[in-house]
């Protein structure tokens, strides 16, 4: 794992097309902005896990009884 230190307003690059910018820090929360091409999915980890679980178990989708 690469560990970086950034201040508010500073940006890091992932590849040539994805940027992550620190927008603010308040207590133990950090606001970040992500700029990425439309074909690159960007999700919080818990949302990503939910999407993966729904892909692996289609019967778990709401409305399917």
Curated annotation (Swiss-Prot):
This is Translational regulator CsrA. Belongs to the CsrA/RsmA family. Pfam families: CsrA. Keywords: Activator, Cytoplasm, Repressor, RNA-binding, Translation regulation. InterPro entries: CsrA, CsrA_sf. A key translational regulator that binds mRNA to regulate translation initiation and/or mRNA stability. Mediates global changes in gene expression, shifting from rapid growth to stress survival by linking envelope stress, the stringent response and the catabolite repression systems. Usually binds in the 5'-UTR; binding at or near the Shine-Dalgarno sequence prevents ribosome-binding, repressing translation, binding elsewhere in the 5'-UTR can activate translation and/or stabilize the mRNA. Its function is antagonized by small RNA(s). It comes from Shewanella denitrificans (strain OS217 / ATCC BAA-1090 / DSM 15013). One of its GO terms (biological process) is negative regulation of translational initiation. Its main location: cytoplasm. Gene3D superfamilies: Translational regulator CsrA (2.60.40.4380). The keyword Cytoplasm applies. Homodimer; the beta-strands of each monomer intercalate to form a hydrophobic core, while the alpha-helices form wings that extend away from the core.
């Amino acid at each position: 794992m690469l560990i970086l230190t950034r201040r508010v307003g500073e940006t890091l690059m992932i590849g040539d097309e994805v940027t992550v910018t620190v927008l603010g820090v308040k207590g133990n929360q950090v606001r970040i902005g992500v700029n990425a091409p439309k074909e690159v999915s960007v999700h919080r980890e818990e949302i990503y896990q939910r999407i993966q679980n729904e892909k692996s178990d289609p019967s778990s989708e709401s409305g399917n009884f």
